[in-house]
Amino acid sequence: INSEQHENNAMVIEQKSEGENQNIQNTNTVKENETSAVKDNIVDYSEYFQGISGCAVVYDEISNTYFLYNKENCETEVSPLSTFKIVSALAGLENNVLVNENSTMEYNGVKYPIDTWNSNLTLKEAFENSCIWYFRQVVDIVGQEDIHTMLKELQYGNSDISEWNGSKINSLPELNGFWLESSLKISPVQQVATLNYVFSRENNFNAENIEILKNIMYVTEYDNGCLYGKTGSGTDGKAWFVGFIEVNSNKTYFAVYLEDVQNKDIVSGNKAKEIAINILSNWENKND
């Protein structure tokens, strides 16, 4: 079972419906400190979505240009789902809860429906297998104050961790959290801006920690470079794939978000990843 299936399986463990109508807000396209001379291009990526409802953001750091498909959805805040593991891993590293890719959290003995979760896991293993209980332990050890401080520095969506223990979409407390269809929300554009801030802009993060984070986000070789990212899967046809491609030290950031209850049987983190890769391949060909 791959990590995207792990997320889907985990999110349906005695899931409770949250309803479709969420209080959402449109957000600025970029962080306040990134607004200078940013350009937006509205694009049509519908051919890659094949009838699935969703949106996509691609950000070219060289030209400082955002390419937006379904702009309104790109600026609408939703749950980050398991893409938040990028931030929780960084928070763990920055606060010395985690020290390297082999930092281990102890398994509690509960029999989970996902076999790869049923043992002690390293950071690398937990990230690859999208293990909720591992990152639940990490954020609890880091604590609410330091998590919130990091979210404010990143300008990460609404930075709302008020439902710290989550919305009880899963029956086990260690499989819930504020980032799983709960209080924390972020838009696809904000996802891209966050990644750009972490990996391409001046910040106060430890360079070794950023390198560890980058290593665990590695997905595959991509053309003449590498693809890095994280999937996220939720209930009722919600899914993410966010990350960047790096070629000769130049990065192109992206976020694909799907939300389609009518096609929920085919919507997954894997599907979002497939769409993102197709968009990026076409985008690169047009920009060679």
Descriptions of predicted regions:
Residues 93-110, 205-210:
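Short, well-structured active-site flanking segments
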Residues 77-102, 126, 191, 254:
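Active-site SXXK
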Residues 72-79, 110-125, 133-140, 175-183, ...:
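Second-shell loop/turn segments in exported
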Residues 103-119, 142-143, 166-169:
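Acidic helix-start/capping segments at beta-turn-to-alpha-helix junctions
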